[in-house]
A protein has these predicted regions:
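Helix-to-loop junction immediately C-terminal to a conserved catalytic motif
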Residues: 52
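Conserved ABC transporter NBD signature motif
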Residues: 60-68
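Conserved ABC ATPase "signature" region
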Residues: 67-68, 104, 116-134
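Conserved ABC ATPase signature
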Residues: 138-142, 146
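Conserved catalytic motifs of ABC-family nucleotide-binding domains
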Residues: 159
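Catalytic Walker B motif of ABC-type/P-loop ATPase nucleotide-binding domains
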Residues: 163-166
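Helix N-cap at the start of a conserved alpha-helix in ABC-type nucleotide-binding domains
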Residues: 174-176
Length: 234
């Protein structure tokens, strides 16, 4: 039986001193590819942030792997985040460095010291995302699609148990969006659990099998056969 990698039971999340997502229940199994949907302002980003410890869970039980988010102390949050690959909406890349040195910075910041092991891991992850040829380019010289591939590569560096992506194709053209989704699909096939927040209906139809919808401070599950445009915007 597949274990539950993410398990939220009767969870209430605090956002700006207010309760939100009251009595939420959902789980994600190891190896799943799950889409998080809902209209703008429905709380998708906040729910994702609760998974990696940025938003506070004040009631219920919430586990990510062997981490109890309800009892997680501040000094353990960096340890949790090394187990999670996060694809931010605003990229957070260092524009004065090339792609390779951006990735070196991440590994050194998370405790890697051996130069050869760092090089080996970076080369491996660049190949997984098909951007080996970009390693010496400044991030400021990259296209939007290339930047997003670098961000995915960065998320893979510490071999995370789950990758969380918040609107990873939001600012990309349709062709680049498909390239990004194909990369995430390939990563998932190779064993990584993926959770993607998006409102792109065409991508949902093409790539999705399991859908969680944020609505009225709660989560509901939608089967693919019932997926409609109204599910996303209402």
């Amino acid at each position: 039986m597949q274990r539950q990698l993410v398990d939220f039971k009767n969870v209430t999340i605090q956002i700006d001193s207010q309760k939100y997502f009251n009595d939420v229940n959902f789980s994600i199994k190891k190896g799943e590819f799950v889409f998080l949907i809902g209209k703008t302002g429905s709380g998708k980003s906040s729910l994702l942030k609760s998974i990696y410890g940025e938003k506070k869970i004040i009631e219920g039980d919430a586990f990510i792997s062997d981490f109890n988010l309800c009892k997680l102390k501040n000094d353990k949050i960096p340890v949790l985040r090394r187990r999670i690959g996060i694809i931010f909406q605003d990229f957070k890349l260092l524009n004065d460095r090339n792609v390779y040195n951006n990735l070196v910075f991440v590994l050194r910041s998370t405790g890697w010291k051996n130069k050869e092991l760092i090089k080996e891991r970076i080369i491996e992850c660049l190949a997984k995302v098909h951007i080996t040829k970009l390693k010496n380019k400044l991030t400021s010289q990259l296209s939007g699609g290339e930047i997003q591939k670098v961000v995915i590569c960065r998320a893979l560096l510490n071999n995370p148990e789950i990758i969380i992506a918040d609107e990873p194709t939001g600012n990309l053209d349709p062709m680049s969006s498909i390239e990004i989704m194909e990369i995430l699909k390939e990563i998932n096939i190779n064993g990584n659990t993926i959770l993607v927040a998006t409102h792109d209906f065409e991508l949902l139809k093409k790539y999705g099998n399991r859908f969680m919808k944020c609505t009225n401070g709660n989560i509901e599950f939608i089967e693919k056969k019932n997926l409609k445009l109204d599910n996303i915007y209402k």
